[in-house]
Curated annotation (Swiss-Prot):
One of its GO terms (molecular function) is 5S rRNA binding. This is Large ribosomal subunit protein bL25. Pfam families: Ribosomal_L25p (PF01386), Ribosomal_TL5_C (PF14693). The lineage of its organism: Bacteria, Pseudomonadati, Pseudomonadota, Betaproteobacteria, Burkholderiales. The keyword Plastid does not apply. The gene is rplY. It comes from Herminiimonas arsenicoxydans. Keywords: Ribonucleoprotein, Ribosomal protein, RNA-binding, rRNA-binding.
Length: 210
């Protein structure tokens, strides 16, 4: 995925405001052995790119004044109530050095799982992204979580996920095998199921004598 940008020398709040009025978004490229470079990007192109999931978790080819570098989107700021991207940060990557990044989780086969198909359960996504490390060439756009065998009362944990080659999950909070998804029957359905046998066992009301 390619991103076009231009180096900028006018810095400060006033300069950034003028950039936005002109339809540009200020940004910065940093990392590696080169010095940080302040850049400008076309606002509309950046705004629409940010809507794409892959833009947030892929190696990008950033062209600045004709020179192309491989980067990751590391941060961006948007206006509180306007459809306006205020700033974007990109980090250079080295093909030989591992990167640390979050990638989205894609949940598949929920509709054929026993929890949904046979037990009228609801699957809850405890996590929606995964912290990983890998070489840039091994970076996946997303990681799949297969729910095909999930049953009510059970969970999918990190150890159940097949990670792509060269990808290692980063675990936080001291939990060795965090929960990724769970399956349960909604409270209302549990009450209905419990009430049904009781209703069946209740004696019929005597008929009125005429």
């Amino acid at each position: 995925m390619k991103v076009i940008a231009f180096a900028r020398n006018d810095l400060g709040t006033g300069a950034s405001r003028r950039q936005r009025i002109a339809g540009l978004t200020p940004g910065i490229v940093y990392g590696g052995t080169a010095a940080p470079v302040n850049i400008s990007l076309d606002h509309n192109a950046l705004y629409h790119a940010l809507k794409k999931e892959a833009f947030h978790s892929s190696i990008l080819d950033l062209e600045v004044d004709g020179k192309v570098e491989q980067v990751l989107l590391r941060d961006f700021q948007v206006h509180a109530y306007k459809q306006l991207v205020l700033h974007a940060d990109f980090q250079r990557v080295d093909a030989k050095q591992k990167i640390h990044v979050k990638v989205p989780l894609h949940f598949i086969n929920a509709e054929i799982s026993p929890a949904v198909k046979l037990q009228a359960g609801i699957i809850s996504h405890v996590a929606t992204e995964l912290d990983i490390t890998c070489l840039p060439g091994n970076l996946p756009e997303f990681v799949e979580v297969d729910l095909a065998t999930l049953e009510v009362g059970h969970s999918i944990h990190l150890a159940d996920i097949k990670l792509p080659k060269g990808v290692v999950a980063v675990i936080h909070g001291g939990e060795d095998n965090p929960t990724i998804a769970t399956a349960a029957v909604p409270a209302g359905k549990v009450e209905e199921a419990a009430a049904a046998p009781a209703a069946a066992a209740a004696p019929a009301a005597p008929a009125d004598k005429k």
